[in-house]
């Protein structure tokens, strides 16, 4: 008995002395701070290992979900080098690394407190996909019996899948389960979700929900029925487009409040829109620095977009104010050491966003204005007032009545101040995050 107790004591000491492995928790959709990873801005070859070396800088932004753009084997036949032209749903792209490299990267994300979701391209495959030869009936055919690309698009590098085929659906769901079981990922961002039938998404999401672990499911689309299919989040395309109209065409800031209301009025209570000022599609045409009137404009747009409500998305490169377009078909190195003051500003903003529940999902009280986004966020005893000048010139705006003359804390400058009795003046693209 004494020997047994001695051995148990030794075993307990060994366990206690081992370093604790940091865990992660899949965030609630309302708490998501997502980072979109385009491997080709990290390295031309071996991106998995290079991304691993950047995780601390990404995590310092309070990112809790890493979204990897397609990391699958790409097709060659009729291809245009798009990562969304997939040859094998169960194989990694060799130029990024090996399956073991990817597993290590996912494990490292988890150790640092970040969940991982992968891009899932359900709508189409490459023309030389492993299904093509053995299962031509899994694809859409035209009147002459030829396999076609997706209708209504110019995506001639990909072949359209036939969702009337039950076997194809099951094979796809099996492939989706593969990455959860084999690599331990935590969900999917489902590409071109508006192109895919509702009943397939319902079948697929139900199947994923039946797996032992909780998963995050994001639809790249704006159909209201995505939530009926079981998705947690979908895209806030309308808000982004309204934002561009405000910054590029001097539209009234009122349209941002109107668009926010319309987006949330059409989805079930408790569901979440993913908010962003850029992503790989948008940055392929223009960088956010170009789209929003410069670095200061891009940050102002980010502030009113993220703090209004919804999940938050950063596109890798945004945090260093990369000034050029990024064609995601090709390697384009980003200097991660550039513009450290911009990185630090994003870090401060997201630290506040992560720390205060009111700033993420507090009650929204909006004060309509033409040139300034003015809104309050309340939760329990937290009360914040945000003012964002959406113009590249000085603007004065009315202060909400109950904030006039109040002593507040300027959260970005870490100073205390007394607000004026009626109006406040903001410099071009200036913003304030004020706490009572």
Q: Which residue ranges define each predicted feature?
A:
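Sec-dependent N-terminal signal peptides
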Residues: 4-13
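Short, solvent-exposed turn/loop segments enriched in Gly/Ser/Thr/Pro and often Arg
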Residues: 67-79, 119-128, 191-197, 220-224, ...
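Short, solvent-exposed helix-loop connector elements
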Residues: 285-292
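Substrate-binding/active-site clefts of carbohydrate-active enzymes
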Residues: 18-49, 53-65, 70-183, 203-210, ...
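Carbohydrate-interacting/catalytic domains
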Residues: 17-67, 73, 295, 311-314, ...
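Short glycine/proline- and charge-enriched loop/turn segments
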Residues: 81-90, 152-159, 236-244, 327-336, ...
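Active-site-proximal helices and loops of the catalytic beta/alpha 8
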Residues: 181, 191-276, 295, 304, ...
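Structural recognition of the beta-strand scaffold that forms the well-ordered cores
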Residues: 33-36, 65-70, 117-119, 187-189, ...
């Amino acid at each position: 008995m004494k020997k047994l107790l001695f051995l148990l004591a030794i075993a307990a000491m060994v366990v206690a002395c081992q370093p604790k492995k940091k865990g992660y928790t899949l965030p609630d959709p309302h708490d998501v701070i997502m980072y979109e990873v385009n491997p080709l801005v990290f390295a031309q070859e071996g991106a998995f290992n290079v991304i691993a070396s950047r995780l601390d800088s990404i995590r310092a932004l309070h990112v809790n979900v890493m979204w990897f753009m397609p990391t699958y084997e790409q097709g060659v036949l009729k291809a245009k080098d798009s990562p969304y032209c997939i040859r094998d749903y169960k194989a990694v792209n060799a130029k990024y690394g090996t399956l073991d490299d990817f597993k290590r990267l996912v494990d490292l994300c988890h150790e640092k407190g970040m969940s991982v979701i992968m891009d899932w391209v359900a709508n189409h495959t490459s023309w030389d996909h492993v299904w093509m030869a053995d299962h031509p009936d899994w694809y859409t055919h035209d009147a002459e019996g030829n396999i076609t690309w997706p209708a209504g698009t110019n995506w001639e590098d990909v072949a359209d899948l036939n969702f009337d085929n039950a076997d194809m659906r099951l094979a796809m769901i099996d492939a989706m389960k593969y990455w959860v079981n084999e690599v331990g990922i935590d969900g999917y961002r489902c590409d071109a979700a508006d192109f895919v039938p509702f009943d397939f998404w319902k079948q697929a999401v139900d199947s994923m929900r039946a797996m032992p672990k909780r998963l995050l499911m994001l639809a790249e689309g704006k159909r209201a029925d995505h939530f009926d299919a079981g998705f947690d989040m979908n895209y806030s395309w309308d808000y982004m487009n309204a934002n561009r109209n405000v910054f590029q065409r001097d539209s009234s800031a009122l349209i941002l409040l109107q668009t926010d209301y319309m987006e949330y009025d059409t989805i079930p209570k408790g569901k979440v829109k993913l908010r962003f000022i850029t992503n790989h599609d948008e940055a392929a045409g223009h960088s956010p620095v170009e789209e929003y009137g410069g670095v200061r404009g891009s940050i102002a747009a980010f502030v009113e977009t993220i703090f209004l409500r919804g999940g938050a998305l950063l596109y890798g490169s945004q945090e260093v104010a990369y000034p050029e377009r990024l064609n995601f078909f090709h390697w384009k190195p980003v200097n991660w050491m550039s513009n450290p003051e911009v990185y630090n500003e994003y870090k401060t903003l997201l630290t506040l966003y992560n720390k205060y529940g009111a700033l993420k999902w507090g009650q929204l009280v909006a004060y309509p204005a033409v040139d300034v986004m003015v809104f309050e966020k309340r939760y329990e005893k937290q009360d914040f007032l945000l003012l964002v000048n959406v113009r590249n010139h000085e603007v004065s705006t009315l202060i909400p009545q109950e904030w006039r003359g109040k002593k507040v804390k300027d959260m970005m400058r870490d100073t205390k101040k007394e607000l004026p009795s009626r109006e406040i003046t903001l410099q071009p693209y200036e913003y304030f995050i004020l706490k009572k």
